């Protein structure tokens, strides 16, 4: 009985550690998309499917004026 309780306790601790590590890994991979993928020309970025996606260039109006 003690052996099965010990095994169950170790299993629960390991599963909690793996779950925590997975969350941290996902946060680091996607965290700070605004800084990573849009250093100078984007308004914002989002994490979509584990990748940073940039959109909404802030310098678009300036480029349009130069084009005309």
Curated annotation (Swiss-Prot):
Q: Which cysteines are joined by disulfide bonds?
A: 30-38, 33-54, 37-47, 42-52
Its primary localisation, in coarse terms, equals secreted
Gene Ontology cellular component annotations, sorted alphabetically: extracellular region
Q: Does the keyword Isomerase apply?
A: no
Tissue specificity comment: Expressed by the venom gland.
- The signal peptide stretch is 1-26
| InterPro entries named among the record's database cross-references | Scorpion_toxin-like_sf (IPR036574)
Cell compartments where the protein resides = Secreted
Q: What does this protein do?
A: Probable weak potassium channel blocker.
Q: Which family does it belong to?
A: Belongs to the short scorpion toxin superfamily. Potassium channel inhibitor family. Epsilon-KTx 01 subfamily.
Q: What is this protein called?
A: Peptide TsPep3
Q: Which organism is it from?
A: Tityus serrulatus (Brazilian scorpion)
């Amino acid at each position: 009985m003690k052996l099965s309780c010990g095994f169950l306790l170790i299993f629960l601790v390991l599963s909690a550690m793996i779950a925590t590590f997975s969350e941290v890994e996902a946060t680091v991979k996607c965290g700070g998309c605004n800084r990573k993928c849009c250093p100078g020309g984007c308004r914002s970025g989002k994490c979509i499917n584990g990748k940073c996606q940039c959109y909404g260039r802030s310098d678009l109006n300036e480029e349009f004026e130069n084009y005309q």
